[in-house]
Amino acid sequence: MSDARVPRIPAALSAPSLNRGVGFTHAQRRRLGLTGRLPSAVLTLDQQAERVWHQLQSLATELGRNLLLEQLHYRHEVLYFKVLADHLPELMPVVYTPTVGEAIQRFSDEYRGQRGLFLSIDEPDEIEEAFNTLGLGPEDVDLIVCTDAEAILGIGDWGVGGIQIAVGKLALYTAGGGVDPRRCLAVSLDVGTDNEQLLADPFYLGNRHARRRGREYDEFVSRYIETAQRLFPRAILHFEDFGPANARKILDTYGTDYCVFNDDMQGTGAVVLAAVYSGLKVTGIPLRDQTIVVFGAGTAGMGIADQIRDAMVADGATLEQAVSQIWPIDRPGLLFDDMDDLRDFQVPYAKNRHQLGVAVGDRVGLSDAIKIASPTILLGCSTVYGAFTKEVVEAMTASCKHPMIFPLSNPTSRMEAIPADVLAWSNGRALLATGSPVAPVEFDETTYVIGQANNVLAFPGIGLGVIVAGARLITRRMLHAAAKAIAHQANPTNPGDSLLPDVQNLRAISTTVAEAVYRAAVQDGVASRTHDDVRQAIVDTMWLPAYD
């Protein structure tokens, strides 16, 4: 090895949270040993952000913009979040879905260094050592987002590249909710991959073996949770894009003892429930009297069903009544309690075919289920494009003046229905929310603004509220409060009004959600911090991209 000395990089330039680039004044440059290390110009943060925005606009592809922002995030954190804050509606699709999916697929090819921690199932004894390399104490971490990348967005298993979904999620926690990025961690739980394309790729950077499952997987996840909670007892443990079976199992196993959160289930449920609450302002029918068909009874669909069930009980229904008014449909059709392959979370909602007069072996599809149940709400979580046909929509309007029809699947190519079609088939009577962003629709001389059931309306505010409360758990009441707070910020008083608030006002939305979550945490006795002026405590906690 050569004894030649190499130039050092000053900490003020190498640490993303400290770096100001050409934002350092000349006095600061002299004090920090940066003389001659930067061009002579000194720019304000606004000027730097304007330069980056100009660079982004000059790029031809969303992936190119994602890569530019990723590198900025890696070296200059304050500027990254300033650009994101100034242009959040435009850049959310770049730093998160859908563009992050493409970035994840190209992770090993484009790897230039990465924020986050990589924990391997092949080295479970190194989990604590890996956390210790960060040099952080028990009071230094508020939020950890981890993924095993088995079910990334709509693209499936992408192994170690899934770290970018955790990084992207944290970026939205900060941009949308003011969660301090210096107090957040992204973690990859690398348990292998079943993606043959990755295993055959000579450049793939993750474990080169099939996904470990069963007892070994469970013990690895348990060890991660125990270690993270012991080292950082105040941290929210957010689980992102786990496979359906593991996502549900982890939440059910640890949700009553640890501050765990699954956005795919709980965040989605809160936002959809918020859209339902807004719809009730139009229909005037109490939640306890609604009947819901869930088309796509997987983890997301039944997670939504669980939250609606809990809200119906809070509205005065018995648990038995609430469950009976939710109708799950999956690949076999309407789910019946005599089916052999029901998942645990589907069982409570499965119907008795004999009570409905359905012969053994007969399949009840969506249209027939609607005729039997006379639902007021139809939720699409199936990823089956076009499943909500004209016949389905007309059946919904036959039993309800203003049916809520929510094609929630992502991306647009997998939506159960196009809003323009639903409005035409329902003669403008349907109340709509979608999972993908949709342009306003003109129908019968009215402009219909279609609310997007985007989880970003919920999870930043939920996280912020939990942090301000120092909550040791995330309870049903807290999620219910978040949904009501989101709905409170939408006012569908006129035909065509959106059922959900605009993400343009995301920081204000998150502040209101955080306050509601905090108050629910106090009410449930899980808060460790109390504040006389809750709103001010929330504002004081929110991190802003600025030079100190």
From Swiss-Prot:
One of its GO terms (biological process) is malate metabolic process. GO terms for molecular function: malate dehydrogenase (decarboxylating) (NAD+) activity; malic enzyme activity; metal ion binding; NAD binding; oxaloacetate decarboxylase activity. CDD domains: NAD_bind_1_malic_enz. It catalyses: (S)-malate + NAD(+) = pyruvate + CO2 + NADH; oxaloacetate + H(+) = pyruvate + CO2. The keyword Oxidoreductase applies. NAD(+) binds at residues 297-300, 410, 455. Transmembrane segments: none annotated. Its EC number is 1.1.1.38. It holds the Pfam family Malic_M. Its cofactor is Mg(2+); Mn(2+). The keyword Metal-binding applies. The active site is at residues 96, 169. Divalent metal cations. Prefers magnesium or manganese. One of its GO terms (cellular component) is cytosol. Keywords: Metal-binding, NAD, Oxidoreductase. It is an enzyme of class 1 (oxidoreductase). A divalent metal cation binds at residues 240-241, 264. NCBIfam families: PRK13529.1. Belongs to the malic enzymes family. This is Putative malate oxidoreductase [NAD].
